UniProtKB/Swiss-Prot annotation:
Residues 1-124 are annotated as: Large ribosomal subunit protein uL24. Keywords: Ribonucleoprotein, Ribosomal protein, RNA-binding, rRNA-binding. InterPro entries: Rib_uL2_dom2, Ribosomal_uL24, Ribosomal_uL24_KOW, Translation_prot_SH3-like_sf. This is Large ribosomal subunit protein uL24. SUPFAM superfamilies: Translation proteins SH3-like domain (SSF50104). It comes from Acholeplasma laidlawii (strain PG-8A). CDD domains: KOW_RPL26. Belongs to the universal ribosomal protein uL24 family. Disulfide bonds: none annotated. Residues 108-171 are annotated as: Disordered. One of its GO terms (molecular function) is structural constituent of ribosome. Part of the 50S ribosomal subunit. PANTHER family: MITOCHONDRIAL RIBOSOMAL PROTEIN L24. One of two assembly initiator proteins, it binds directly to the 5'-end of the 23S rRNA, where it nucleates assembly of the 50S subunit. One of the proteins that surrounds the polypeptide exit tunnel on the outside of the subunit.
């Protein structure tokens, strides 16, 4: 799937592809991709395919009622908008500065943000060699947030070692 979260897409198929304004002009619905489900091959687009969900009052949501939320639509029903021409376009992949990026096939403009060039294997090995000798070990976030453990005083437990001797009578 060539779509990523945050892309601006237009609905090209399905029942929710057009919006009609006050003058009666049909325009295709567009929106930003909020979530992607790669298993089901669906996307959730902001402002598209809005459904009404009846919600019961819960402890987190004191008031119940009818809530409008966007429902997923199939990824084949949307196309990415070309940032230059503002029309639906297909996506291609190419390598720029050693990094694989997506580009719009209509205008040729790169869709991904400018990424840092990929480091060569020699640079990675050199960096690993210098970082291991110069810098101390990294402290993880969990280690920073961990509270020190208080020492617990050990209490001596006295054992009852006195054994009553039985008398001659056996009592």
């Amino acid at each position: 799937m060539n779509i990523k979260t945050g892309d601006t897409v237009v609905v090209i198929a399905g029942g929710d592809q057009f919006a009609v304004d006050k003058k009666g002009v049909k325009t295709r619905k567009t929106g930003r991709v909020l979530k992607i489900d790669r298993v089901k091959n669906t996307v959730i687009v902001e402002g598209v395919n809005i459904v009404k969900k009846h919600q019961r009052p819960t402890s987190a949501n004191d008031k119940g009622g009818i809530v409008e939320i966007p429902a997923p639509i199939h990824a084949s029903n949307v196309a990415i908008l070309d940032p230059k021409t503002n029309t639906p376009t297909r996506i291609g992949h190419r390598i720029e500065n050693g990094v694989k990026v997506r580009y719009a096939k209509k205008s040729g403009q790169t869709l991904d943000k400018a990424a840092k060039p990929a480091k060569t294997k020699a640079e990675k090995v050199e960096k690993a060699a210098t970082s291991s000798t110069d810098k101390p070990a990294k402290v993880t976030k969990a280690a920073k947030e961990a509270k020190p453990v208080k020492a617990v005083k050990s209490q001596k437990v006295e054992k009852n070692t006195s054994v009553q001797k039985k008398g001659a009578s056996g009592k």
